[in-house]
Amino acid sequence: MRPGIQKPHSKTRALVAAALSVSLVFSGPGISAALADTTAEPSAKQPNIVVILVDDAALMDFGAFGGEAATPNIDALAERGAMFTQYRTSPLCAPTRAMLLTGIDNHKTGVATIPEVIPDEHRGQPGYTLSLEPGVLTIADRLRSVGYRTLMSGKWHLGDTEDEMPQNHGFDRSLALAASGADNWEDKSFMPFYHEAPWYEDGKPYDLPEDFYSSKYLVDKMIDYLDTTDASKPFFAYLPFQAIHVPVQAPAEFTANYKGTFDEGWHVMREARYQRAQELGLIREGAPIAPMPADSRDWNSLSEEDRALYAARMEVNAGMLEAMDFHIGRFMDHLKEAGTFDNTIFLVTSDNGPEQNRGDNSALLTFWMSFNGYHIDMEGMGEIGSWGFIGPEWANAAASPGDLFKFYTTEGGIRVPLIISGPGVEPMRIDSPAMVTDLTPTLLDLVGAPKTALADDTVSMTGRSLFPVLTGAADSVYGENDIRALEVSGNSALYKGDYKITRNNPPAGDSRWRLFNMADDPGETTDLSESQPEIMQDMLAAFDAYSKEMGVLEMPAGFDTVQQITRNTGTKIFQRYGWQITVAALVVLALIVVALFGTWRMLRSRTS
């Protein structure tokens, strides 16, 4: 058995409940009150909170969950805390961040989707403004109101104007990346949708230093904020890393640790994770696993050169994850030296499943890279100037035992790791459901902070506090008839008991609803919609009700995520360079006219 998450056994819950009954830092108000919307009593010294958000990490990427990369510091937090095996998030980054920070469904926050994929028909509609709307309060707003200093260092992606930056959403100090990503070594954009890397400190444009590497610098900045703010106050520290989002980049000393690890290819890795998932009880023994997508390349059919290239891409990915963990360790050491570590609650999770997009199959991206100092070659892979990626096959392997990856509401896109540790949380494994909207109310309860006390709190939280589960007062905060639903850009999922319905758009989906029994079939291999039509209709009705309540908009006919990104990117480029493009087009047209006129005159002179 690998260290970290352990297979469940029948006595775990009883032992945890007994231990917690004598060791809780907070004295809860009772089971029934905890299950209702009450908070724990505050302790004499309120705990600090650290939220670590990894970008694009799969369920089994951390060592504690069975991953190949070395993540000893994350694993240490897992060993001393609660590890959630049935946690779901959004399939896209910005909606996850909005829900995580507010406890509110993404459509009610204003961040229903991301700017890169929104269709014109939705732009600016209620819930689709792509920034936190009035009346939506963050956990930073709430904690600052009860005396916390609130700090952030990392990716924001919840608006791109000064008014939409973290300082106007409860944060005292912030270094924030407004885009979906950026280069990890240099102060520059990572895709043509963005003209530059929009970094802001406390709402003002910020230039990165020459020796920048994202994971290191984000931790350095957070340490600086901790050391230069009022140490008499408890702190809320939000660390949303760029790792392991594209471009996948890592210092060579970390990448070198994985030489040869992935040489057997993506089929072998997907099968190995599937076997470990059964050993660890992440899925039942013998549960089926979905085949890799039909357009997946056969590893053995690749040339030796291509196999080496793609194995190296995954080595950099693992190196980037280990580098992030190393700097998390530096941050933890700083808290230990300051004497605050033992009174700090840590929450570690991922915003969605692994990224499948490639950097070698888009003419637009290749053209843009050539003008922005990027390459995708083996030489220097992961280092300055490299635009690293893992592609759809490795992403599907990383998402094992789930199906597909980021963007989709299959399990590979939305089932990710969750760890909560610190005062009031005993070591345990939690197999009951949890959703991204549950995190803010849970953290507020753990520190005894109110959830509905502010005058401008006009949008209610939709998530449920997991406090009763963490304290052993309940096995689950979701009953058999309670629904849990998600929707982003038409990709949708709804859970009820053991069942799940899901719908995914092209290119990997076909926009059809399907029904699965997740207890029997966590790989989503057998559609039950025809054999169990009553359950299907009941859950479709529940999703319709959810959509009406949350203000979900119907997608335009024929919506395709990749096509929409291309259109939106083209629009952005024309907005930035419209007059240059127009002038260039006129010059080309004039040259064509001149050439045609010259040809006409020449032909005329010959015939006269």
Predicted regions and their residues:
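Long, internal low-complexity/basic segments
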Residues: 45-47, 54, 59, 83, ...
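Active-site-proximal N-terminal segment of extracellular/periplasmic enzymes that hydrolyze or transfer
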Residues: 40-82, 91, 145, 156, ...
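C-terminal accessory region downstream of the catalytic core in glycan-modifying enzymes
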Residues: 82, 157, 204-205, 210-215, ...
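Active-site regions of oxyanion-processing enzymes, predominantly non-cytosolic
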Residues: 44-48, 100, 160-181, 215-294, ...
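C-terminal cap/loop subdomain of S1 sulfatases and analogous C-terminal strand-loop tails that border
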Residues: 172-173, 177-183, 383-413, 421-519, ...
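Short, solvent-exposed turn/loop segments enriched in Gly/Ser/Thr/Pro and often Arg
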Residues: 63-69, 83-107, 112-114, 152-164, ...
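Active-site segment of extracytoplasmic enzymes that catalyze sulfate/phosphate-ester chemistry
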Residues: 58-148, 173, 179, 183-199
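Histidine-centered active-site microenvironments of extracellular/periplasmic hydrolases
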Residues: 162-170, 249, 333-421, 567-577
